[in-house]
């Protein structure tokens, strides 16, 4: 009589190929990446407008020079280059009834990254300039719809 050895029965559900786990992890990472990217795009679409005070090249200009926003949006001015800049709205180049002093920033933003924010609600064009660099052409316009 011969002895027969039998391997213990294995459960198919307990054995998972490594490749499947790696593939599943890659799918999860891929979906998570798409979700994060979608969230970032959604947030960017609803973000306030930003104007740089000074170009990346070092030029004395507002970037963008002209900006169009919707009524009630906030414009964030960011000192990009570290030169002293301010934001002065020209009382003769803003909608009637808007107080230029109330929306201007006369004090200088001296360091890179310093910001000034203003919420504009009255429709129309808002002309503004940087007082120390106006002669160099540092002027801008915001169109509020």
UniProtKB/Swiss-Prot annotation:
Q: Where in the cell is it found?
A: Plastid, Chloroplast thylakoid membrane
NCBIfam families in the record: cyanin_plasto
| Cofactors, names only | Cu(2+)
For this chain, the family text in UniProt reads: Belongs to the plastocyanin family.
Residues the record lists as binding Cu cation: 85, 130, 133, 138
Would the keyword Metal-binding be found if you checked this record's keyword annotation? yes
CDD domains (alphabetical): Plastocyanin (cd04219)
The family database entries (PANTHER family) matched by this protein are listed as: PLASTOCYANIN MAJOR ISOFORM, CHLOROPLASTIC-RELATED (PTHR34192:SF10)
Record-level Gene Ontology MF annotations: copper ion binding; electron transfer activity
Gene this chain is encoded by? PETE
Q: What is this protein called?
A: Plastocyanin, chloroplastic
Going by the UniProt record, its keywords in alphabetical order are:
Chloroplast, Copper, Electron transport, Membrane, Metal-binding, Plastid, Thylakoid, Transit peptide, Transport
Please name the InterPro entries in this protein's record.
BlueCu_1 (IPR000923), BlueCu_1_BS (IPR028871), Copper_blue_Plastocyanin (IPR001235), Cupredoxin (IPR008972), Plastocyanin (IPR002387)
Q: Domain named Plastocyanin-like: which ranges? A: 48-145
Please explain the role this protein plays, according to its UniProt record: Participates in electron transfer between P700 and the cytochrome b6-f complex in photosystem I.
Q: Does the keyword Thylakoid apply?
A: yes
Organism, scientific name: Chlamydomonas reinhardtii
Membrane topology category = Peripheral membrane protein
Gene Ontology cellular-component terms listed: chloroplast thylakoid membrane
Task: Cite the residue span of the transit peptide.
Answer: 1-47
